């Protein structure tokens, strides 16, 4: 299924120049914090992998295991490193730390 926001960069002319990181986000469809986090990623032109875990307790447990026990959404990972949720994402951006993080390619497996 195509990401809901995939068409927005085309509409706005946004490009993902310089973004090399692998970005993953665990969400609930109606969560306002999830929507806000995805909008910031979209605004920056980031293509991300979204895991919608609405009502899926197994998926939520898997997310919590990966996120050091955190069970709130969104949970955002950049190059397999958990950065937290929406507030942490915006905090990184306001401190000028998000763009360099997004420019870092993932470690080869």
Swiss-Prot record:
Keyword Cell inner membrane in annotation: no
Family: Belongs to the glutaredoxin family.
S-S pairs: 31-34
Signal peptide: none
Organism field: Synechocystis sp. (strain ATCC 27184 / PCC 6803 / Kazusa)
InterPro entries documented for this protein: GLR_AS, Glutaredoxin, Glutaredoxin_subgr, GRX_bact, Thioredoxin-like_sf
Top-rank lineage group of the source organism: Bacteria
Function according to Swiss-Prot or TrEMBL: Has a glutathione-disulfide oxidoreductase activity in the presence of NADPH and glutathione reductase. Reduces low molecular weight disulfides and proteins.
GO terms of molecular function: glutathione disulfide oxidoreductase activity
Stated name of the protein: Probable glutaredoxin slr1562
GO biological process: one example: cellular response to oxidative stress
